[in-house]
Amino acid sequence: MLRVLPTSFKSISTRSAFRACQLSPLTVYCPLKSSQGTDIKSLEDLTKLKSLEGVDPELIRKLINERTIELNVQNELEMLKNLNKQEKMSQEVSLKRFVRPLWVFFLMSSTVYLILHYVWWKLEVVEKEKELQSHVESLEMELDQTLKSQNQNVSSSQNNGNNKTNDKPWYRKWFF
C-alpha cells in the first residue's frame, strides 16, 4: 500500500520519507506475536503491554522509525503550510505598504491640478480684461474723434450763423 504526498511537497527529506513509507508502511508489517500472545501493530499496542521482554527489538525499532517518519512528514507539512501563510501575509503587507503612498500621490496630484487650473483661469481673466480694456480705449478714441468732428461742424455752422444773426438787432433774436 502506497501513501500519497501532496505534489507541492518537494523537499529532499520528504522524498526519503516517502521512500521509507513505500518500503515499510505500517499496514504491510505482519503482526508479530510476542511471547504474551498479542498482536503488535503500532506503538500504542506496545504501551498496552506490561513489559517489553518478549517483543522483538527489530519490530520496536521499525515501529519507532515509522512513527518518527510520520511525525517528520507531518511537521514538514505544517512547516510548508506556515510558509505559505507567511508568504501570503508578506504579499498582503507589501500591498498595504503602497496604499498610503498612493493616497498621498492622488491628493498631491489633485492639489497641483487645482492650483494650475486656478492659475490658468486667473491668466485667462487677466487676458480678457486687457482685451476688453483695449476695446474700450479704441471706442473712447472713436467717440472723441466723432465728438470733435461734430463740435467743429457745429462751431463752423455757428460761425456762419452768427454772422447772419449778428446783423439782426438783439430784440429780433427773441421773436424770430
Swiss-Prot record:
Compartments reported by the entry: Mitochondrion inner membrane
Keywords for the protein's UniProt record, in alphabetical order: Chaperone, Coiled coil, Membrane, Mitochondrion, Mitochondrion inner membrane, Transit peptide, Transmembrane, Transmembrane helix
The keyword Cytoplasm is annotated on this UniProt entry: no
Region annotation (Disordered) ranges: 149-168
Mitochondrial intermembrane side stretches: 122-176
GO cellular component terms, semicolon-separated: mitochondrial inner membrane
Top-level taxon of the source organism: Eukaryota
Signal peptide: none
Coiled coil: 123-151
Location of the transit peptide in the chain: 1-28
Mitochondrial matrix side: 29-98
Major location (coarse): mitochondrion
Function of the molecule: Component of the INA complex (INAC) that promotes the biogenesis of mitochondrial F(1)F(0)-ATP synthase. INAC facilitates the assembly of the peripheral stalk and promotes the assembly of the catalytic F(1)-domain with the membrane-embedded F(0)-domain.
Assembly: Component of the inner membrane assembly (INA) complex, composed of INA17 and INA22. Interacts with a subset of F(1)F(0)-ATP synthase subunits of the F(1)-domain and the peripheral stalk.
Protein's UniProt name: Inner membrane assembly complex subunit 17
Gene source species: Zygosaccharomyces rouxii (strain ATCC 2623 / CBS 732 / NBRC 1130 / NCYC 568 / NRRL Y-229)
